[in-house]
Regions:
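Pyridoxal 5′-phosphate
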Residues: 1-338
Length: 338
């Protein structure tokens, strides 16, 4: 079929926001300079765009200081930075039972270093009760790490209430916003978030290969930088700068990715995230209603749009899901993920 319908936005959004591709192409063709190194106008202009992108992200997540916006190659890198830069032998963390491998695999790697985790139980639809968190806190618990919304069933977790619990117990609170950023409002200060990890290529409608994290001042004092190298600042010293964002951004950052993300964020600011989210949920509600007319289909998670995002997973227990996905593309041009 010539017409294609893309249903894999939970993995990577497409199409991208307008001007993302053209802004990246223009940079690469007309002046792919570096920042913090060159003493010429093009480098200064590019540095201003990077600063503007930090400010856009600080506004998006209600962070008080754009210097606390750190760019990384993606959210997996960001979460590894947190887990491996914060935890020490004897530490314990709480994680949701819905976590992505970007959290679980690093934690499993650290098990041999006497670093342990406990999973917070969830109901069959992904619902997580805040009181379940409080009951699992130990004297050696250092942080709570959880996604904001499941990448499988779309269920939204109560991060505001859990953030309050973390504050009362003096725990660091880290939130993975891979699925929720660009869809719902996330207030880093109101939710008491110390570490907010984001990626550009999903709900933010930007390119792959660019992500990052926002960090609180309290956590910044505890987090160990994992990478050392050139920053374009204090180059006469063999010691890493101890100020943000340079402290966590060694090497050449992904400038084409940042410029593409800037274009995407500009689009989101103009279109309005609430309006975009409303449209997504209208379509999701219609999809859920119609899919329930198919008796062989099982919906993972919540059956309505209440407390969920536009991420829907289906199971057909009587059939091979891979064969269904193959048929959907070959016969109907519908691209899905199994």
């Amino acid at each position: 079929m010539n017409q294609k319908i893309y249903f894999d936005n939970g993995s990577t959004s497409w199409p991208k926001a307008p001007q993302v591709a053209s802004s990246m192409s223009e940079l690469l063709e007309s002046g792919a300079f570096n920042i913090n190194r060159g003493n010429y106008e093009g480098a200064y202009e590019l540095e201003s765009l990077v600063l503007l992108t930090r400010m856009q992200l600080a506004r998006l997540f209600h962070a008080p200081d754009s210097r606390h916006v750190i760019f990384t190659p993606g959210i997996t890198y960001s979460l590894n930075y947190l887990i491996k830069g914060l935890l020490r032998p004897g530490d314990h963390v709480l994680v949701s039972s819905l976590e992505h491998n970007a959290v679980m695999r690093p934690l499993c790697q650290l098990a041999s270093q006497d670093i342990h985790y406990t999973m917070i139980p969830a109901e069959t639809d992904g619902t997580t009760q805040p009181e379940s968190v409080e009951a699992l806190i130990r004297p050696e618990t250092k942080a709570v790490i959880m996604l904001h919304a499941s990448n499988v069933c779309g269920t939204i977790l109560p991060i505001r209430e859990i953030g309050d619990i973390c504050r009362r117990h003096h725990l660091f609170f880290a939130v993975d916003t891979a699925q929720s950023a660009g869809s719902v409002d996330i207030d880093m200060q109101e939710c008491n978030i110390d570490f907010l990890a984001f990626t550009g290529h999903k709900g933010l409608l930007g390119p792959q290969g660019i992500g990052g994290f926002l960090i609180s001042e309290a956590l910044d004092h505890e987090l160990t930088p994992l990478i050392a190298g050139g920053t374009g600042s204090q180059s006469d010293s063999l010691l890493m700068p101890d100020y943000l964002p340079d402290k966590y951004e060694s090497g050449t950052i992904n400038l084409p990715g940042i410029i593409g993300l800037h274009a995407a964020l500009t689009y989101l600011e103009e279109a309005g995230i609430p309006a975009i989210h409303q449209k997504k949920m209208e379509l999701t509600g219609y999809f859920l209603k119609r899919i329930q007319e198919i008796p062989q289909a099982h919906i993972a998670g919540k059956q309505t749009i209440q407390d969920r995002l536009a991420v829907v997973s289906l199971d057909f227990p009587e059939y091979d899901n891979a064969e269904i996905a193959f048929s959907l593309e070959q016969d109907y041009g519908i691209m899905t993920r199994v």
